[in-house]
A protein has these predicted regions:
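Extracellular protease catalytic domains of secreted zymogens
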Residues: 1-162
């Protein structure tokens, strides 16, 4: 599972906006794109990729990311490191977010859910679709895109989908 990044804004416990994380001024941005080496998996067949400068074309090779989460260090995760509180971000913070979610889902089910990508692509409504922003080369678009994949998690909906 490839993880992309967003910048999330919230108020009163509710998400007010979520866009592609691309903070060029401070050098941080989520990656994403289309592989030159890995074949298109069956669960990505029929998808398109949208470039930042416009234009959409069929996805012909493996596209990443599959999913995303808050990666902006300005809106990231409160952690304690060496007795100091700090906020971290980056897509390397999104991967453990997803790992933790899947671990919780596994704990709640009778057996492990296994490889969940096909189920997520079959149930894109289980994710919050991110449709604003770009990562430099690719633009967010409805459905899967090469910035945020299918979107960010709604934990209960993801659990129901897998």
């Amino acid at each position: 599972m490839g993880c992309g990044g967003t910048s999330l804004k919230a108020s009163g416990g509710s998400i007010t906006s979520e866009t592609v994380w691309n903070d060029g001024a401070n050098g941080g941005a989520g990656g994403g794109g289309v592989s030159s080496f890995f074949a298109l998996p069956s669960y990505q067949e029929g998808l398109n990729v949208t470039r930042t400068e416009g234009g959409t074309q069929p996805l012909r090779m493996r596209g990443v990311p599959d999913v995303c989460g808050d990666a902006d260090p300005q809106t990231g995760y409160d952690v304690r490191v060496d007795a100091s509180d700090t906020i971290i971000g980056g897509t390397s913070a999104v991967a453990p977010l997803w790992a933790g979610l899947i671990a919780r889902i596994n704990a709640a089910k009778a057996s492990p859910v296994g490889f969940i990508n096909p189920a997520l692509y079959s149930h894109p409504g289980s994710l919050r679709d991110i449709t604003r922003g770009n990562n430099g080369s690719f633009a967010a678009a409805p459905g899967w895109d090469a910035c945020t994949g299918l979107g960010s998690p709604n934990g209960q909906k993801v659990a129901d989908a897998v």
